[in-house]
Amino acid sequence: MLSPQRTAAVASRGAGDAMENGKPGPVQVVLVHKEQHSFELEERALASVLLQDHIRDLDVVVVSVAGAFRKGKSFILDFMLRYLYSQKEGGHSDWLGDPEEPLTGFSWRGGSDPETTGIQIWSEVFTVKKPCGKKVAVVLMDTQGAFDSQSTVKDCATIFALSTMTSSVQIYNLSQNIQEDDLQQLQLFTEYGRLAMDEIFQKPFQTLMFLIRDWSFPYEYNYGLQGGMAFLDKRLHVKEHQHEEIQNVRNHIHSCFSDVTCFLLPHPGLQVATSPNFDGKLKDIASEFKEQLQALIPYVLNPSKLMEKEINGSKVTCRGLLEYFKAYIKIYQGEDLPHPKSMLQATAEANNLAAAASAKDIYYNNMEEICGGEKPYLSPDILEEKHLEFKQLALDHFKKIKKMGGKDFSFRYQQELEEEIKELYENFCKHNGSKNVFSTFRTPAVLFTGIAALYIASGFTGFIGLEVVAQLFNCMVGLLLIALLTWGYIRYSGQYRELGGAIDSGAAYVLEQASSHIGNSTQAAVRDAVVGRPPADKKSQ
């Protein structure tokens, strides 16, 4: 029997294989090692989804479903998939599909044991055009069920916190009612947001929807959103005679989320609950449940209702979401739950990293336009001028983006950005220099010049009777000739590259020493025309 870790790993590889075969499927992005109670980010899998060319720079909408295990989270997400695929194909009112069609998508099944472990996202990111004409990327996220027999409170809190921190809509999946312990668990899971808010002066999370399953009191509050909101107002209402602890729980929820809603769903029917052979066919689901599904899913995913993920007032792109995942997972990989400040620190770090990555792209793309790829050789002076221009453009872009942590915190990332730009510039200079025909023949020219000079010196010293010196010059001529032939073989065959590099370095050193004895004007001409090296960075002088 597979261990939980092995099962999750197999699921992750299976999703990866599905993507390679062109078939969408769930992708494991946060792996739970239950025996060690630790978490691991599957960065490569997450990047393969979020960094696809057509969506990487789109603002992202993340819809997550979280809650206790075996309460039908994946079941609901699969109906969301049906709706999104229906919209992708043009949209029609009967998006629920054929009554005989089994429900597929995120893995789910009946029974008492949990099916999902860690955090999964759907491999296909849906692009949706909002009524205003803006395109957004929609990501569906499934989470491990809370409070199973193998999960600690820390495990549950970590998964819920991660999904809430990275989603724009968190659906809190509950059974039958909103109990007081449900609210207390929610308070525990979102405590980081409440404390971080004291410093950033705004609500850290966006939309929370209580999704009440198997609602049994439609005679008090009708199914759907309207009845749900009336029920929620009553359950979260703060009264003077309530105990302070109960008041704090309710105030905390309102202080953490910008918007809180509730939807009441009826029971899907006995066939769904009791049959071991139920495979999600609509014909086996109660009509009341299907009717409410047709109200719930469009309410969450209708283009006019979609809410982009925001952090610190700035919208997050798919590429930025990857950075936030990487930053957040670090603070949960220790032994203890992080101090609430850690979330603020990690958020600020990811925020600055995303801004730096965007600024770096601006510099790189502009430099590629003038000297990248098949572009012709560019004068080093012009290259440096463009470098300084685009560097300033990138820095201005970085400074303009709203970032958490303050100026002092962001300054470190600005310095790192400048270092990365400097490295890019050096690489562009090398690439540009390789296009200079004089630079290509620098080493053989130096060797040939040395051979000719030593040959003349050998003849002259032999003529005046200095035979020993003449023989020494002849030996040096032979060595240089061997070096020239060796260099030619290395360039032709591609072998012994280290030796070829040593010969190039030696030739460059000789040329540099020779150039140092020539006047400034001659020196500049030699370096620009023969060596093809960029002038020294004016800022470093």
UniProtKB/Swiss-Prot annotation:
The region called 3HB (three-helix bundle) domain is annotated at: 343-434
Signal sequence span is: none
Domain of life per record? Eukaryota
Q: For side Lumenal, which residue ranges?
A: 467
From the UniProt record, list the reaction(s) this protein catalyses: GTP + H2O = GDP + phosphate + H(+)
Q: What EC number is given for this enzyme?
A: 3.6.5.-
Q: What class of enzyme is it?
A: hydrolase
What are the N6-acetyllysine sites (modified residues) in this protein?
Answer: K391
Record's subcellular location = Endoplasmic reticulum membrane
| Region (N-terminal hypervariable region (HVR)) residue spans | 1-25
Q: What is known of its domains?
A: The GB1/RHD3-type G domain mediates GTP-binding and hydrolysis as well as homodimerization.
To which protein family does this belong?
Belongs to the TRAFAC class dynamin-like GTPase superfamily. GB1/RHD3 GTPase family. GB1 subfamily.
Q: Could you describe the subunit structure of this protein? A: Monomeric and homodimeric. The homodimer, transiently formed by two molecules on opposing membranes, is the active form mediating ER membrane fusion. Interacts with ZFYVE27; both proteins are involved in endoplasmic reticulum tubular network organization. Interacts with REEP5; both proteins are involved in endoplasmic reticulum tubular network organization.
| The protein's name | Atlastin-3
**Source species of the chain:** Mus musculus
